[in-house]
Amino acid sequence: FSFDRQKNAQNPYHKVSGGSYEYFEGMGLPELISEVKKVDDNTVQFVLTRPEAPFLADLAMDFASILSKEYADAMMKAGTPEKLDLNPIGTGPFQLQQYQKDSRIRYKAFDGYWGTKPQIDTLVFSITPDASVRYAKLQKNECQVMPYPNPADIARMKQDKSINLMEMPGLNVGYLSYNVQKKPLDDVKVRQALTYAVNKEAIIKAVYQGAGVSAKNLIPPTMWGYNDDVQDYTYDPEKAKALLKEAGLEKGFSIDLWAMPVQRPYNPNARRMAEMIQADWAKVGVQAKIVTYEWGEYLKRAKDGEHQTVMMGWTGDNGDPDNFFATLFSCAAAK
């Protein structure tokens, strides 16, 4: 049921809650999954149209969560099919008590859980997009756990003995994407020149407060399959100028530089980063105009190819390198 709902447009639940299955469709699963068969009461068999090495890793993602068909049928019969998504029944250690859109999600420990009973009775997720506000809540004990602090706040957090700051390498990558359908970015020498002109180490210090590394691969260094032998682009303005001269652009040119309007773990301050890239490019004769839009509009316009250069990024979902390569570089991703 949970997979047929996403794959089959004729399933009565396909359009419930908007009918948007970004991950399922974006990962090409409608074409990959030929059939799902029941083997016995505790076993199902997936029939695929081709070998797919990361398939088991894909099934560990949120979109593959198993929903109760019995509950879905009951809600459809009652005329409230949306409750399947807004008041779901799962198999975890906590039971949903309350959901306030864009505000909070409240859970309580589920007495009938099949595994070890959780050590807390109540779990509340307070939806707080702004890292500064999250930090303020933590300081006031309005919350006890917060993720993704502002890099600028990390030093202060380390000095606060009441805070236990835990760190680990992120499973993400931030990047600047070039639109090769637009001149002069259709010339590889121009793209290389722009890359050589950017001082990534300075950006790591100023934007990430040192909590980052220069990316020379599409995948993070903590992920299996990472090739450390790949050579990074060094910061070399003179080489950038030479490449621009070879491309017939020694007098420079103008370009737009799209900066994300939101904070992300892979880019906590896109505006500051854009200003630094703008200054670096100016040193080799390239004049960049910083452009931004509301986040939804930003993504839509970028997908439509309106940009010349655009800041984007990706946070891994399942620990498999394919989740980076296929998601960002496959033919399906280009659409």
Show which residues each predicted segment covers.
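Short, well-ordered beta-strand elements
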Residues: 44-46, 92-95, 105-106, 121-127, ...
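Append "and occasionally in soluble cytosolic enzymes with long acidic Gly/Pro-rich linkers
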Residues: 106-111, 159, 186-279, 283
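Acidic-aromatic pocket-rim loops
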Residues: 12, 299-335
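Ligand-site clamp/hinge motif
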Residues: 1, 82-85, 110-156, 167, ...
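Aromatic- and charge-enriched surface segment that lines or borders ligand/interaction sites
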Residues: 1-13, 39, 45-47, 134-137, ...
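Alpha-to-beta junction loops
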Residues: 42-44, 139-148, 276-280, 284-287, ...
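Surface-exposed binding/hinge segments that line
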Residues: 16-73
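Extracytoplasmic/peripheral linker and loop segments enriched in polar/acidic and small residues
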Residues: 34-37, 189, 204, 283-298, ...
